[in-house]
Amino acid sequence: IQGVEKIDNRASYKIKCNLRILPRDDEQIKAISVITNFDFGYGILSSPPGSGKTYMASNIITRLKERTLVLVDQDLLLEQFMESILEFTDITREEIGIIKSQTLEYDLDKKVILATMQTLVKKKDILEKLSTNIGFVIQDECQIASCETIREILKELRPKYILGLSGTPYRDDGFDFLIREMLGP
């Protein structure tokens, strides 16, 4: 439309990174392609256990090349996600930041930041600092995450892209629609 200017206030902070391992099957290739070509910038990758969701998320990080915040529910998932990023990409341990309850210092200038949601939601000062330099947010196991916690975090951030990962898109409490409302279809 002539005379109309599109304003995009979403944060974008480009990083350099590459993939080490190619997708293992056509399903991964298709899912990665659909997600990296989405114009609206958000969505949920729902795929069965063992299908390679963390691989696909790592692949997407290398394609979007945006500073990424990965939200997890517990320390074990944080460690597993970090190992996947280290295995599947050329991102080094020194380029990954950690935000969890036992961490005393937070380096927010890393290419990828892994955070437990419970710790991050309590650290308003950190959320404020992240609000301008995170271009991509990944919510791992989005079906079990607290909707209120996700909402608290996402209202502070303005990422260009948001991706939820789920083995099943359904919640036990029936509030599936809230996850889709925050993270997309």
Where are these predicted regions, by residue range?
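Hydrophobic residues on the short alpha-helix immediately C-terminal to a glycine-rich phosphate/catalytic loop
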Residues: 35, 56-64, 81, 153, ...
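Conserved helix-turn-beta segment of the N-terminal RecA-like "Helicase ATP-binding" lobe
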Residues: 76-100
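Conserved helix/coil segment N-terminal to the catalytic DExD/H
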Residues: 100-136, 147-152
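Conserved pre-motif I regulatory segment
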Residues: 6-46
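Post-DEXD/H (motif II) to motif III coupling segment of the RecA-like Helicase ATP-binding lobe
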Residues: 135-136, 143-185
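Conserved phosphate-coupling serine/threonine residues in phosphotransfer and NTP-handling enzymes
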Residues: 49-51, 116, 166-168
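Charged, low-complexity intrinsically disordered regions
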Residues: 1-2
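Walker A/P-loop
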Residues: 38-64, 69
